[in-house]
Amino acid sequence: MVRPDALRFQPSDAEEPESSPRSRWGEQPFAPETVAMMRRTRRHPRPTQFDYLHVHRLVDDLAAVLARLGPGVEDVLDIFCGTRPYNDLLPPEARVTGLDIPGNPYGVAEVVSDEFLPFPDGSFDLVMCIEGFHYVSDPAKGVAEIRRVLRPGGHAVVSVPFVWEYDRTALEHRFTGPELANLFRRWEEVAVIENGGRAVSWATLTGLVVSMGEWHVPARLNLRRLARPLFSGLYIVINGVGLLLDRAERRFARSSLTLPMNLLVTARRPPAERHS
C-alpha cells in the first residue's frame, strides 16, 4: 500500500511528460543479452565507447568509495537500479535489493514501484542511487526518505550528472557540488567527488556528437556494422586526447572553477540518531 504522503519518482500518469523515461522505453522489455551488454558498458567501459572516460572515472570513484565503507554492510538498496552494473563492487555477503519504476525494460529489480521509497524505517545499511537521483521530483524530500530507510550509522552513495544533455519535456534536476553538500548538511562525513573535469567533459561530449552520426548510419545492408570500425577508431582518438588533457588538467589546474561530468556524494546517517 502506498503511503498517502509518499514521494514518487516522477509525476503521476496524468501529469507524466510525453517524453518521460517511462514513455521513451516503450512497452517491450529488453532481451537478456541486451541487458548484459548494457551492464558491461556501464561496469567495464572500453575506449571504443564514446563515453569511456566518463564511465571509467565514475566506476573508479564508486569502487573506491564502496571499498572504504568497511564491514557491516549487510542490507543494500539500489535505487533506480537499471541493469545493476555495480553489484559486484559490494561485499559478496551483502543482500542487495534493486528498486526501479514500473515500465522499466531491464527486468532485474526485486521491487518495482513509483513510490520513493516503499520500505520500512531503518531497513538498510547502505543506500545507492547511481545516475538516477536527478529524476526525483523533490530532492530534499528524497534525501529525507533515504535517511529514513537507512539504519543509524548507515551510508548513502548518490551520483548525478552535471555536464550532460537533458530532455526538454522531462523533469530533471542538475546540481553543483555545494548544492549536493547542502542537501546532506544534517548528515555526517559528507564528501562530494567530481568524476572528471573539463577534459573528460570535452571528450565525452565530443564523442556524443560523433555517436549521433553513427546512429544515423542506416542499419540496412549491414551499413552500420561496416561503419563501426571507423567510429570505434574515432572514439579511441577522442578518448586518447581526452586522457592526455585530463592528466594535464589534474596536474596544473589550481582554480576553484570546475566542469565535471558527474558528481558523487557520500554521507553517513549519524549513528546515535533514532528512527523518526
Segment roles from a protein language model:
Residues M1-L117, L126-M128, T258-L264, P270-S276:
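Conserved N-terminal segment of class I S-adenosyl-L-methionine
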Residues G70-P71, P91, S137, R151, ...:
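Short conserved AdoMet
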Residues P118-P120, S137, T176:
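GHKL-family ATP-binding catalytic core of two-component histidine kinases
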Residues D125-S137:
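A short SAM/SAH-binding and catalytic strip from SAM-dependent methyltransferases
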Residues A140-K141, H155-P271:
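S-adenosyl-L-methionine-dependent methyltransferase catalytic module, highlighting the catalytic core
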Residues A140-P152:
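A short glycine-rich, Lys/Arg-flanked "PGG" loop and its adjoining helix->strand segment in the class I
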